[in-house]
């Protein structure tokens, strides 16, 4: 409903590609001519990740999915599956294969392309849930962060000035170990080191903001984290630079009455809603020539 709709949209908990194809054909979205990138993931429930993009602004040059292998908290390995390869597995992230002890969860989607002529990399995430408790399940998200860091480091190895945006539902806050230590994202732009990551959601959390509420406590599981070349403080805007971030929580996305007033408006008791999470966004700036 905005006059300038998002150029790139990362989505989580998508049942299948058909859902996204239907979405971009709805009356409000059809005029914007969005493209769709999606892989089926091993998650049995069909809650995949995907990417929507405005074709006039972003041209994908490559995309792949990176499978997270978790074995009851044991080691993981990264398998990149290119376009056309089959997805593997068929269990959800709280079930364990009795033979292999593997916990099935979502893949991480890497999309590289030209954003208004400039190379940018997007990684869409939906890290393992907190099923079984935050502490007990934390190693699974730490492994997801390790995989994410491996992808990012590989992009930095090719180009130390790589412009990378990693985003999604991390099922952890900006302060959790998975984000701060395993992934290495910091909350102050001036503290971002070379080949580092800046997390604008850290300060939002400190200010009491949130994308998800549980037992009257807000947290920010939904995060957009940018690489140092994007976050670098400079007066040079001849190329894309991070400007600002926010949580999109207009009143129509909120419960408007009752015990959960102000919470995200989710499907409940047969009443349709939008989501139990508020979406987040970032703006990038670039001088027009």
Where do the language-model regions lie?
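Extracytoplasmic/secreted proteins, especially bacterial periplasmic and envelope-associated proteins
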Residues: 18-22, 47, 140-143, 147-154, ...
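Metal-dependent phosphoester-hydrolase catalytic domains
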Residues: 103, 142, 153-164, 172-289
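Active-site His/acidic residue clusters
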Residues: 118-140
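Active-site metal-binding loops of divalent metal-dependent hydrolases
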Residues: 14, 127, 169-170
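Extracytoplasmic/secreted cell-surface and envelope-processing proteins
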Residues: 18-22, 45-48, 131-134, 173-178, ...
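Sec-exported extracytoplasmic/periplasmic mature domains
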Residues: 1-4, 16-29, 57, 150-160, ...
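Structured beta-strand-rich core segments of catalytic domains in phosphoester-bond hydrolases
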Residues: 14-18, 22-119
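Loop/turn elements at helix/coil->beta-strand transitions in domains of secreted/extracellular proteins
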Residues: 4-8, 31-34, 116-120, 159-163
């Amino acid at each position: 409903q905005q006059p300038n709709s998002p150029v790139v949209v990362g989505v989580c908990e998508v049942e299948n590609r058909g859902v996204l194809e239907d979405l971009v054909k709805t009356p409000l979205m059809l005029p914007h001519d969005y493209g769709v990138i999606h892989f089926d993931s091993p998650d049995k429930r069909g809650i995949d990740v995907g990417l929507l993009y405005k074709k006039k602004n972003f041209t994908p040059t490559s995309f792949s999915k990176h499978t997270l292998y978790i074995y009851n908290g044991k080691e993981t390995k990264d398998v990149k599956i290119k376009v056309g390869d089959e997805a593997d597995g068929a269990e959800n992230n709280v079930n364990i294969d009795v033979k292999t002890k593997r916990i099935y969860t979502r893949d991480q989607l890497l999309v590289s392309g030209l954003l208004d002529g400039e190379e940018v990399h997007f990684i869409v995430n939906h890290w393992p849930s907190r099923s079984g408790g935050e502490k007990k399940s934390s190693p699974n998200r730490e492994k997801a962060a390790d995989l994410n860091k491996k992808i990012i480091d590989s992009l930095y190895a090719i180009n130390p000035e790589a412009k990378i945006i990693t985003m999604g539902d991390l099922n952890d806050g900006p302060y959790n170990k998975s984000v701060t230590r395993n992934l290495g994202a910091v909350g102050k732009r001036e503290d971002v080191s070379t080949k580092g990551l800046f997390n604008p959601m850290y300060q939002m959390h400190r200010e009491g903001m949130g994308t998800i509420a549980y037992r009257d406590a807000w947290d920010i599981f939904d995060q957009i984290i940018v690489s140092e070349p994007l976050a670098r403080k400079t007066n040079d805007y001849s190329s894309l630079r991070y400007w600002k971030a926010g949580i999109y929580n207009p009143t129509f996305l909120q419960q408007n009455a009752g015990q959960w007033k102000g919470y995200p408006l989710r499907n409940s008791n047969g009443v349709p809603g939008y989501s139990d999470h508020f979406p987040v966004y970032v703006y990038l700036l670039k001088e027009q020539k």
